[in-house]
Amino acid sequence: MRFSIQPTILFFDSGVGGLSVYKETKQLLPDCHYLYGFDNGFFPYSEKDEKDIIDRTLRICQKINQTYPLDLIVIACNTASTVVLPELRRNFSIPIVGTVPAIKPAAEMSETKHIGLIATKGTIKRTYVNDLIKNYAYHCMVEKIGSTKLVEIAEQKLRGGEVDLNVLKQELSPWKTMKSLDSVVLGCTHFPLIKEEIECCLPQVKFFVSSGKAIAKRVKFLLKGIEVRSKIQKKNLIFCTKPLEDDKSVQQILDFGEFENLVILSD
């Protein structure tokens, strides 16, 4: 699908995990104008107050929209998606896409009807997630692990750091002996970035399911017939709320997402 005029799409997360969703969308829609914003000044969202998450997400999206008129926003963060979508939709007239743990497809794929959900602590405790399980995995045994450490490991990897498999195995150790566990939901957008390492720790699992491809298809559908707000040729950019520690981290992120430049947003 090619666009003669580029729709501008913003992907937003507290960290770099949302780049996994961005990559899936860019692969499907290579000719759009892409912006990526991450609130590293308040990272991680998983254990933060809901009101603070809502306020910061809205403020950052509005600030980017002032300079780069947006046609669609993807909240590429499972934790934020459980709380911010209603407020964003009240303040924007453009499509807003959230990220939902892929519990339904995992339950459908599972042959043993024994599935696992790895997510942040914030996502795990949301009523919304329990409702998804009740509606779509009521016939399955569902295990849950809420982990901030896995998010930090994924961040380190994308910035050029090493993944400590021993730490990863420790986080996932409750599932090590569950032989019937055959499907795992990667319920945080960071986790596809360390999927290979997670697979090594859970060799009995046949299916690892994330939301990236489904979100990309949803974005493609919503862009049909959209009236693009800004019709100039644009560069793909990334935004953060706090300077990164070193130039290597900046370059790793720019290269991974094929972005032209990184912009630091001031409060």
Swiss-Prot record:
A Pfam family reported for this protein in Swiss-Prot or TrEMBL: Asp_Glu_race
Keywords: Cell shape, Cell wall biogenesis/degradation, Isomerase, Peptidoglycan synthesis
Protein name (record): Glutamate racemase
Keyword Cell wall biogenesis/degradation: yes
Taxonomic lineage: Bacteria, Pseudomonadati, Pseudomonadota, Gammaproteobacteria, Pasteurellales
Keyword Cell wall biogenesis/degradation in record: yes
Gene that encodes it: murI
GO biological process, one term: cell wall organization
Binding, substrate: D13, S14, Y45, S46, N78, T79, T189, H190
